[in-house]
Amino acid sequence: MKRAVVVFSGGQDSTTCLAQARHQYDEVHCVTFDYGQRHRAEIDVARALALKLGTRAHKVLDVTLLNELAVSSLTRDSIPVPDYEPNADGIPNTFVPGRNILFLTLAAIYAYQVKAEAVITGVCETDFSGYPDCRDEFVKALNHAVNLGMAKDIRFETPLMWIDKAETWALADYWGQLDLVREETLTCYNGIKGDGCGHCAACNLRANGLNHYLSNKAAVMAAMKQKTGLR
């Protein structure tokens, strides 16, 4: 039996990964993390989506220690979430240091226990928000370290790594979940479901990608299939 664990926030990217995993694996588990995030409404959204999409199990893990260690606008109400700046340089203040290191490591430990062969994460470096822990080289390096540390071959899968946001919408549509992802996921840094606040970087990337996909469906779908190998 093929099993996978999805690092699941209830946002656009991880929900698209979950929709695909349900078709590619016999048994899918989800792991969601409560780190005291500003947009922690995503936890309830993740619970509802995991139930709706039919996962084998959904674990919500308390990692609020991260909130004490990692200072970010996503972990401190006193630090405002910045409006989207398309030409901004450097790492944004929404970056939570160590977040994906911790999430992927804990997901791999869970995968070890349930005998899953893969941990799936929705990170992407094509049009990402400047986070160093979304890069392909980081995921591969951590995957190697985790496998050495557990003497186990658990594969970190990144289905969205080389596709952009428009193509991510196409992937959701390919699996018949475009409306669900559009209406029921929570991507917004300010914790607003669906189209979100419309001001933060997450909302702008999401909206721009959706608009591009809806305006160029055939071309974007073809590009997504070419990059992912789907037919």
UniProtKB/Swiss-Prot annotation:
* Catalytic activity from the UniProt record: 7-carboxy-7-deazaguanine + NH4(+) + ATP = 7-cyano-7-deazaguanine + ADP + phosphate + H2O + H(+)
Key words of the record: ATP-binding, Ligase, Metal-binding, Nucleotide-binding, Queuosine biosynthesis, Zinc
Q: Which residues cross the membrane?
A: none
For this entry, list what GO says about its biological process.
queuosine biosynthetic process
What domain of life does the native source organism fall in? Bacteria
Co-factor binding comment:
Binds 1 zinc ion per subunit.
Give the residues the record marks as binding Zn(2+): C188, C197, C200, C203
To which pathway does this protein belong?
Purine metabolism; 7-cyano-7-deazaguanine biosynthesis
Q: What does this protein do?
A: Catalyzes the ATP-dependent conversion of 7-carboxy-7-deazaguanine (CDG) to 7-cyano-7-deazaguanine (preQ(0)).
Tell me the protein family, please.
Belongs to the QueC family.
Q: Which PANTHER family match?
A: 7-CYANO-7-DEAZAGUANINE SYNTHASE (PTHR42914:SF1)
What is this protein identified as? 7-cyano-7-deazaguanine synthase
Query: Which species is listed as the source?
Result: Salmonella heidelberg (strain SL476)
Lineage of the organism:
Bacteria, Pseudomonadati, Pseudomonadota, Gammaproteobacteria, Enterobacterales
